């Protein structure tokens, strides 16, 4: 399939099979007409949704909204929309005509099982850097400014090193977010960028919200093809007020954990091992304690990979005819019962959370700014190479340590000691931003037509009460306030839903 071409399947056409590339550098988006008499598909969601053959306004599904509330993501191939699907890592869609109607048969096969690695394969550090550079440079569009989202992490620094060794320092600017506190990566990023010969620019949190930022927020949600529940979603409208990203090349380091080893923390690994057997108690616990430790102790194995949200008890109060996401994740646990946890985590977090929460936010941003998004780690050649390497080069099961070869390369080449530095996760104070525009946030939530207006007010106030009382889980309640806002503001203002 050619990239960004809008394809059409009509009734009685020959059966076709739709797949994405191996690591979903280019997911395929499908629209099935309401009468099931034609089907459109493309690697460009913007091209698909902007087509005159797609009936608008688009209709959302109660099931999709239910998943966003409870889990933060809609399981693929489904989306929050009726009749729009995503074919991503491991998905296949067979399209055929049956009784004068178009039918889609979806199937799933995870392509990155660790048992399929080649134990005899050897590592080639030069090939790794050259392939990463090629995956980036081949996608750069000339006469566009180019930006690399850069941090102190292994993924973006591997790309930066590869580009530097290929002589592309003068064509790319490294950008990093200056976070508050001891998790700020921008100083390290700036130092490495200078060492490698790149220009560097810091992105800052606002001290107050001005009209420019509010306009950028409105523009973002009005034009975002999909909702994204990522905690740093609001950072992107902020970035757009500091750099003009319109029509640029955007390079990001996401997308490699699925095939390079999706390694959990030791705490997560132990909790899923010991506690996931108790998930059958969930229906009872949900009636008593929707957000406390007892609720967490009844997580399914799927949910231990990073899925959490508003309880079904509260979801059913604010959303009429809501769907209980727990039943779906319970079935996934059964279907993948023979996966060890590293394969299981890669098959679920890697293909769903990483794709449709983390990467989706920057895909949205690229579509909104008409930018050329480049995800070098998802390149077919890169993914094929790493997916066949022996585990010993990539991760340590006993120590739960990831990306061993990248740690080695970066330490030897640029002196970046990831072991000494430790985990420095990207930090963005989304709740401070929400509180700067609290009246606006509350109005978007309280007057959203998705919700029961009496119950949503009770729920929102209960979250604020827990936050203001410094509840031990106040960080989680802040996340849930943000989730209500992200869904509500998208539903209220999005041009595809409100056309």
Regions found by a protein language model. Give the residues of each.
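Short, solvent-exposed loop/turn segments at secondary-structure junctions
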Residues: 22-26, 45-48, 154-156, 181-182, ...
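A conserved beta-strand->alpha-helix junction
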Residues: 186-222, 249-254, 325
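Short secondary-structure boundary/capping segments
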Residues: 166, 217-221, 261-274, 499
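Cysteine-centered catalytic environments shared across enzyme families
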Residues: 1-204, 208
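Phosphate/ATP-binding catalytic cores across multiple sugar-kinase/actin-like superfamilies
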Residues: 125-148, 241, 245, 354-360, ...
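A conserved donor-nucleotide-binding helix/loop in the catalytic core
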Residues: 229-244, 347-354
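Active-site adenylate/phosphate-handling loop in enzymes that bind or generate adenylated species
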Residues: 237-317, 361-382
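Adenosyl-5′-phosphate
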Residues: 84, 304-499
